[in-house]
Amino acid sequence: MKFDVVGIDMPCLDFAVNVDHFPEPNGGERIRELSWQGGGKVATGLVAAARLGARCAVLGAVGSDSYGRFCEKDFIRHGIDTGGLLMREGRSTSLSVVLSNRETMGRAIIYNLGTAEKMTKEELPLEAVKNARYLHLAMLDDVAVEAAKAARQAGVKVF
C-alpha cells in the first residue's frame, strides 16, 4: 500500500491535563479537562495528517504494556497503519504528563522514559518508506538516516 506520510517515532502515552493556571507551590488547581492520548512529535503529526485525509503509517516501537497497547489502538482509531509498529515484549512505553495552562497558553511536561528499545536499522521496513510521498522524522539517529537515504533515492520528500 502506498502512503501519503510515513513517520518514524518512539510513541509515548500522553496524559493531558488542562487547568486555568498552574498552582503555586503547595497549592492546588481544579482540572478543567483531561484525556489520555497517543503522543510523540511524529505521532501527533501523523494524527493531524490523517484527520485531513492523508493515508499514514507509523514505524517504531513501544512496550507490550497497557500504554503501548493504548498507543497502537489510538493510531488505529485515527486510521493510521500500525503494521510497522513493534511491540517490545516485557518492556514499558514512555509516559508523559502534559500540564496545559489556559491562562498563559503555556505547558509543562513531566515524563518517564519507558524501557522499550527503539526500532533498529535491521527492523526498518524500507519498502514502506520508499512507497510514501513524505517521510516524517523527529530524531536524527541511525534509523532516521537510513530511512532518509532510502526516501531520497526513491524521490520521497523528507521533513
Question: How should each PLM-predicted stretch be described?
Answer:
Residues 89-91:
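Short, glycine-/polar-rich solvent-exposed loops and beta-turns at beta-strand/coil boundaries
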Residues 1-61, 66-70, 77:
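Glycine-rich phosphate/adenosyl-contacting loop at the front of the ribokinase-like
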Residues 1-11, 61, 74-87, 99-159:
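Ribokinase/PfkB-type carbohydrate-kinase core domain
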Residues 93-98:
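Short alpha-helix plus adjacent loop in nuclease-associated cores
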